Amino acid sequence: MATSLRGLDAGPGSLRRWILICFAALLLLPPRPNLGYNENYTEPVCGTPWWPDNLEESHHWPWEASLQIEDKHVCGGALIDRSWVVSAAHCIQGNKEYSVMLGSSTLHPNGSSWTLKIPVGDIIIHPKYWGRNFIRSDIALLCLETPVTFNKYVQPICLPEHNFNFKVGTKCWVTGWGQVKQHSSAQLTPAPELWEAEVFIIDNKNCDSIFHKKTLYPQVVPLIRKNMICTTNYGEDLCYGDPGGPLACEIDGRWILAGVFSWEKACATVPNLSVYTRITKYTIWIKDQVSHGAQLGPCRTSWLLLLPWLLQLPVSL
């Protein structure tokens, strides 16, 4: 049997008080613990990962993130602090419920004690994102509902200063669960294990010229802009590899997030070219968003933003 609110003698003042009490209770709830992350605890400096003894066999990318919908991998990402992951804006598919997996190089970790699966509490897409034709400002920030506990399997990558210049020829690494050496007609399914490929930064003008040869756009229309960064490996790259995945470069002993994977030329062609969102063009924006989020507390920001609106609702139901 339905109960009328009128029968509860709830006036405008009391209803607003109840709303405030409910929101206060939600905000005071302790965050859900990240079980399994007390072993090998470290308080890392960004961009200084733990490496296996044999570097020839494999590297270790503790900032690598898998953005998932209903436990299915959709995009890559990079952990930049306890609560924030950087990914590509075009990965966000409307009003979906996302989670982020951290601490594993496989998409199916089988209950590994160091693997985290954390719901995404808030998503911020850059206001100048353009998703048609050649993508622009392809960057998004994912705020985790629960801050992570760092250990040797989960650590952040460094953000570059906004005025840092990644020189042409710089050797970097691209990682992700994308296909490797697959024909363009192959079915696009994620690889079960994390791939890595060594790539080199190339000049934007050279990259732009190569792309123009494959399009009908006139030369006066730039395809590769200043807020993008271009790489090649002349034959071995992450073909159809993870959108949103990190381009990581080791600079003076620290690993720096140079780019976020955005789009690429077909990997059946040579040279293999990949285009990334250039992080230096967005460092200030990222830091502003992270700082603002820290002031609001854990990523229940969507609830907080709704609070003023809820308090203005009419009470006659």
Swiss-Prot record:
Localization per Swiss-Prot or TrEMBL: Secreted
SMART domains: Tryp_SPc
Pfam families (alphabetical): Trypsin
UniProt keyword Transcription, yes or no: no
Family affiliation: Belongs to the peptidase S1 family.
Signal peptide feature range: 1-35
Record keywords, A-Z: Disulfide bond, Glycoprotein, Secreted, Signal
Protein's UniProt name: Inactive serine protease 45
Domain Peptidase S1 positions: 44-291
Organism: Mus musculus (Mouse)
